[in-house]
Amino acid sequence: LVMPKDERGGYSLYDINAKLNHRFSEQDRLFISFYKGKDHVYYKYKDEDKFKQTHNWGNILLNTRWNHVFTPQLFSNTTLAYNRYVFDIRQEETSSIQQPDGSTIINGSNNLFHSGISDLSISTDFDYHPLPAHNIKFGAKYIYHQFAPEVQTVNQHNSDNGYPQTNDNYSLNNSHIHAHDFSLYAEDDLILNEHWKINAGLHFSFFNVQKQTYLSLQSRLSISFQATSNIILKSSFSQMSQCTQLLSTASLAMPSDLWVPVTRHIRPMKSFQYAVGVYYTGIKNWEFSIEGYYKDMYNVLEYKDGESFLGSSHNWEDKVEMGKGRSFGVEFMAQKTAGLLTGWINYTLSKSDRQFSTDGINN
């Protein structure tokens, strides 16, 4: 794409990965990993007026994991991690106005929209094999969240024949939200006999934000039945509660999702999912499966009609509606597991819809 001399645009990105592993003994190992990535898009033009827009987004992740073996049946992983995601949009505009007396007035504005989330977490996970038929996993995790859903700063200035006249700075929706997230979990992979396997688990979460505390107890259950040597039947149920959600803006092709937390007014999203599946391995080096699922969702978030993260002084909580939704579908898969050529082909047929009780969103 060739642009005029007064018009420019471009895209760049980079990714950095680093890993370090060290074995202190047969019982203790340390794993350190680092990742940083950033994408940058810009567009600008210049004639009598000037305009420039940049869009940046990226992640940084630092993870330290200590693996300790207590006994041949019990080991643990303790992880300390920091994760940060940000994206921003910056616009700079300058316009010139020629006055009848020959003087020139220059008006300018700099607008910056910034959003992001950073997490500092520590977790301990245990894996325990008391018997060959039992694989028990349990652990705990704490996360300190720092949300910046919407931070907008505006600078407006003008000059007359090079002499500054005004220079105004102000902020819109300069919101920062801090939250404490603590969870406990336990699950057991249990082999009952040669035909039946069960995985059962519980997850407890404590989420504190803006002096409001949300508690939840979530259950998970999956059952597997070996009907024949080549056919396995599976079914599962899972209950989830989510205290952070992604708000998406469909009008922008580039990443523009906002990570937002529950607040005093926004409740956690809850979901209940049911699934069944049939798996067949009767053909050598091939696996086939068909799975169906149904999911109910409550307290889902969507922008009201005409709203987005840009161009409004309203807080993000005033731009969204809470509603309910459902999704269901069926998935087919064929996989070649061995031979000169391996791979898989997958087809999914699904539907998802949302319903809101107010007129703020088209139902």
Regions found by a protein language model. Name each.
Residues 1, 36-40, 82-86, 142-148, ...:
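Transmembrane beta-strands of outer-membrane beta-barrel pores
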Residues 2-4, 14, 44-50, 59-61, ...:
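Extracytoplasmic loops and strand-loop junctions of Gram-negative outer membrane beta-barrel proteins
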Residues 13-15, 57-61, 117-122, 179-185, ...:
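Transmembrane beta-barrel architecture of outer-membrane proteins
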